[in-house]
Every structure is written in structure tokens, then in C-alpha cells.
Amino acid sequence: MPSSLEKLSTNRVKLTIEMPFDELKPSLDKAYKDIANQVNVPGFRKGKVPAPVIDQRFGRGVVLQEAINDALPAAYGKAIEENTVVPLGQPEIEVTKLEDGEVVEFTAEVDVRPDFDLPDVSAISVEVPAVEVPDEDVDERVETLRQRFATNTEVERAAAKDDLVTIDLAGTRDGEVLEDATASGVTYKVGSEGMLEGLDEAVTGLKAGESAEFHSTLVGGPLRGQDADIKVTVTKVCEQELPAVDDDFAQLVSQFDTVDEMRADLRTALENMARLDQAADARDKVLEEVISKIDIELPTNLIDSELEARRQQVNQQLAQAGMTVEEYLEDSEEEVDNADDFWAEIEKRSLDALKAQIVLDKMADDDEIGVEQNELTELLFRKAQQNGTSPEEEAQHMMQHNHLPDWMQEIRRGKALASMVGAATVTDSKGNALELDRIQPDGTIADKQAEEDAPAEDSAEKADGKATEESKAEEKAPAKKATTKKISAKKSAGAKATTKKVVDAKSDDKPAAKKPAPKKKTAAKDDKSK
């Protein structure tokens, strides 16, 4: 099947593909069969209508059109391989010649991956913070366990700091009840400052059955940011008694006999988490360093479509949270404070993510990185765990939305990134060289002998660290305040290291750089005392 390539611009080409009619015959036969199964013609059983009759009654053009549509994807894919280009979007296809019985010619204009060389990754060095766990972090974990196993006793006195109260909240404005600012049976710790401003002062000194009123700004739901008059009624006051931190406590909340053992285990868990963050930071920095050494010109169409998709995704997340951009920025960790700068930052992160995908895809191609069945299975189970679904449901979703190519691409990118980081020199702030390929998904470090005995393909998964987290902007309750995380660019697992601030929405969108078809042990036990 002859084909030629014309370069229209740096990142766009036009393929001209000539398809002899004998190569179209299988699609023609299929078209006749499909049409025969769909139409009713007097004198013929369904599915048994001869080709000449179909031509006579419905026209040869109908058959040719269906046959060409069926044959185009394979012809286009073959031309892509023959001309060694990597498409970055859907092609614009036009049939330019159709000589019945002779030849079909069509053109396909498509954006392609920029031509660039990868730098020598072995020459790249990055430094990340050393893994350190302050005593204060361990103390905080111990305090969390004390809170979990505290004894709450109902009392008949007035509420005081650190008491647990059960309250009803009713919001009004100009005497009108605000349903979205009303809640019953809410448990609240006095002095925690975790809900409405003024609530702590209002409930302090109230006994069960007593009420107080105050004015505040709502911090969640559709009325977020609006002022309202709030009436709070205390229905129950409980005194909270925290257990002493002794060996009995350690035996109650953990698998250990002493407090020292429990604290050591908590510290280890925190170190593992910090190690995963350290590995992610290393991947970020290595990938950013690689990208900084490459001049990549992204296709305009690709940029426009990605930015529009990202803007829609962010707006959807904000709508689900009942927030405007301005309201989001008030409580978020974003480094910008106005909408224009926010969208500019979103654009920058999106473009960085696209560049990361393109770089990792090229490395995967250059290194001929493949995908094993066990890697697909691991990804399936990981996604099911992340999304709170069963492996069967996740597999069904994948098949329904044709996500298999996306999953394979995600795995290849992850392995390419692992290879890239493994080739670079990574040290911590104390000058220690890091062996990121020995870090397990739970943050532990693999035994060297076990690592040598493990299958080679496992190393990519270990180096990739934590699985991709798909977070969604959650709708805030009318009377509860929370810190909002950053919103960032959507990326695949392989490209996640370009930024750490990721809020991903589960999407059926195909990745921008996909080849398209045409058109251990833990200190805390389960709390069973509740």
C-alpha cells in the first residue's frame, strides 16, 4: 500500500495513502454482508440479498462509503508505521480519489510528536531533602490514638474546652431559614476551631437543652462565603477522658508490649511515608531537569484541546465543591491569590504535563519498553483499590471505554521514568546516595538479596513508588471548614512527577500523546470499642 509523507510544519504532516482495490475487497465483502443483514428486500431472506441487488436498490456509493470507512483505520495505521511518525491527535482524513475497481486514495493530516534528542540522563544530578521524622510528628500520631480510644462520659454540666458536644445548627438570614445551613446531631469538640467562626464561644457554657445565637460566614456548600445568623442548640455534653500513654495503652492500641516499641513502629511508618515523598520529589526533579534540557515545540491544536479539557475539568471540580475560583483560593494551598494567575498556573502545569508525557513516550520507544501481563494485572488491582471498586468493575470500565491502550501507555511511562531516575544521580541533603529502585510501594526498602532474586520487571513498579492518587474536590458541609488542596494538571501515572499538586478526575479522555485511530505491621489496631 503506497504512502508518502509531506511535512506541513514542524509538528504537522500530511500522509497520502493509495489503497489498491484488491486490498479493499475484504471491507467490500463485509459491507455487502452488513447491509444485507440490515435491509428488507422483497423476494430475499434477510442477510441473503445479492450484491447486485444492493447496488441497484441502494447504490454502489453506499457500499463503497461503508467499505472505505471500515478499511481506513488499518490503512492509516500502516502508513503511520511505514513513515515512522508518532501522532498526537486525531487525523483529518479526506478521500481524494475513488476509482471504482481500481484505486482509493486519501490524505490524513495529523499533529505528530516533535523530533528531539534526549539528553544524557547519567549526567544529571539532583538533591532532595533527607528523610527525617521529628519527635513532634510521632507525638501527634500518639495523640491521635489517644483520641481514638478516649472514654466519653455524658455530663450534666455546662460545656467547656475539650468536651464533645452534640449540637443542632440552624442558619437564617433576615428571618428566612436556610436549609443548606441547617444540620442536626453534629458532634463537635469544643475549642477545636474546626467549624464555623464563633461556634466555640457560642457553645462554651451551654448545658444540654440550651441554645445560643451568633453571626458567622458559612464555609461550605452552595452558600459558602455568605453571612448568616446561626442558632446552635446543645443536645448532649460529654467529658472526654484520654488514656494515659503507658505500656497498657500500647498493648491496647497496638501489637506491641511497650510504649517504646509502639513509638518506634509509628516512627517507622512515618519514615516510610516520608521516603515515598522523597522518591516522588526525586522523580519530579529528575524529569524537570531532563525537560529543561530539551526544546519541545508543542502542536497548537494539542495545546488548545488540552487546555480546554483541563479548564472544563477544574470548573467541574469547583462546581462539585460549590465554590468559585476566588473562594477556592481563600482556603487552598495555591501560591496565587487571584483568578487570572490561577488559570495561568493551571495552563503552565498542563503544558508541563504534556511535555513530560512526550519525553517519557519517546524514552519508552527508544528503549523499546514493553508491557507484561502481570503489570496490567497489578495496575488493574491498584486502580480498583484507588477508586473503591472491584477488579471486575474496573476491568469492565476499561473494556467499555477502550482504556487498554491508555493503561499500557501509563505502564510504559512509569517504567521509562523509573529508568530515567535510575540513570541519574540522586542524593539527599546529607549527601547520601539514594537507591530508589529498592523502595517498595509501602515505603520500605527491599533487601538487596531479595531484590536480586526478584523479576527484573518488578523494579519499575518499586521505583515508581506510590500509586497514582485520583482526588476529587469534595463538597464541603455547610458548617465545616477544611483546607483545600491544590488543583493541578491531569497526568498519567508515568508523568505524575512533573508536579506534586494533583487533583485528578476520573475521565474517559484519551491521553494527549496516544497513538490514535482515525476519526506490615502497624501500631494501631482496629478500634472495636465503638
Swiss-Prot record:
SUPFAM superfamilies reported for this sequence: FKBP-like (SSF54534), Triger factor/SurA peptide-binding domain-like (SSF109998), Trigger factor ribosome-binding domain (SSF102735)
Transmembrane segments: none
Primary site of residence: cytoplasm
Highest rank taxon of the organism: Bacteria
Broadest EC class assigned to this enzyme: isomerase
Region named Disordered: 432-530
Enzyme Commission number(s) from the entry: 5.2.1.8
Record-level GO BP terms: 'de novo' cotranslational protein folding; cell division; chaperone-mediated protein folding; protein transport; protein unfolding
Signal sequence coordinates: none
Compartment(s) of residence: Cytoplasm
Basic and acidic residues biased stretches: 459-478, 501-512
UniProt keyword terms in alphabetical order: Cell cycle, Cell division, Chaperone, Cytoplasm, Isomerase, Rotamase
Catalysis performed (reactions): [protein]-peptidylproline (omega=180) = [protein]-peptidylproline (omega=0)
One MF annotation (Gene Ontology) recorded for this entry: peptidyl-prolyl cis-trans isomerase activity
Domain PPIase FKBP-type: 162-243
Record's GO cellular component terms: cytoplasm
Primary role: Involved in protein export. Acts as a chaperone by maintaining the newly synthesized protein in an open conformation. Functions as a peptidyl-prolyl cis-trans isomerase.
Domain comment as written in the entry: Consists of 3 domains; the N-terminus binds the ribosome, the middle domain has PPIase activity, while the C-terminus has intrinsic chaperone activity on its own.
Family designation: Belongs to the FKBP-type PPIase family. Tig subfamily.
Record-linked HAMAP family: Trigger_factor_Tig (MF_00303)
PANTHER family, sorted: TRIGGER FACTOR CHAPERONE AND PEPTIDYL-PROLYL CIS/TRANS ISOMERASE, TRIGGER FACTOR-LIKE PROTEIN TIG, CHLOROPLASTIC
Protein name per the record: Trigger factor
Gene: tig
